[in-house]
Amino acid sequence: MAYARVLLKLSGEALMGDQSYGIDPAIVQSIAEDVAKVVAKGTQLAIVVGGGNIFRGLKGSAAGMDRATADYVGMLATVMNAITLQDGLERAGVATRVQTAIEMQEVAEPYIRRRAIRHLEKGRVVVFGGGCGNPFFTTDTTASLRAAEINADVVFKATKVDGVYDRDPKRFPDAKRYDSLTFQQVLSGELAVMDSTAIALCKDNNIPIVVFDLFEPGNIGKAVAGEAIGSRISNAT
């Protein structure tokens, strides 16, 4: 395997499937089975999951909610997703722990960096919920932060598109997909990959990002093996 320790970022929307809201159990199980295959080969894997399938803080703020309050509601939504993923992973035979940045010890461990790393070393998957515990930060930024903290080799952003484009491929059929590009290109071009804080964290800590289509069967395994799928972002192309 090309990567020994991976941070997988899943959007909340990815868990919806074809629904407009909520969680599709079939999608959760499909993701869990793909992860199980990777873990069985010895890769250490942690997951950060978003909450946009249940609540998105920015939308709440735009509707008049206090921004910090809306972000806290969004953080709680990510915990719901994290526990759901844990259930799916355990049914797929993968030992899993959920750690949350906001303590709720009846359902999850508090986030403790050294404990998270120890879980990974023991072959368990760790799902991080609750964002980074502070409002005004996205779950993409949380993914970059946790990747740096656990010394991950790479961040996988598994999404609904097959890579990074120079413009929206849904609106522009002639949009160009990048096979590889630099962090500086993403920041300078304001490309819609992750927010600038998330990109800067990976740039400063020299953690590459691979963006790929989550719904292409076997893509998580291909990405872990270092196959050329999606778009790779790093300090050098």
Swiss-Prot record:
It is found in: Cytoplasm. It holds the Pfam family AA_kinase. SUPFAM superfamilies: Carbamate kinase-like. Gene3D superfamilies: Acetylglutamate kinase-like. InterPro entries: AceGlu_kinase-like_sf (IPR036393), Asp/Glu/Uridylate_kinase (IPR001048), Uridylate_kinase (IPR011817), Uridylate_kinase_bac (IPR015963). It catalyses: UMP + ATP = UDP + ADP. GO terms for cellular component: cytoplasm. Pathway: Pyrimidine metabolism; CTP biosynthesis via de novo pathway; UDP from UMP (UMPK route): step 1/1. Belongs to the UMP kinase family. This is Uridylate kinase. It comes from Prochlorococcus marinus (strain MIT 9303).
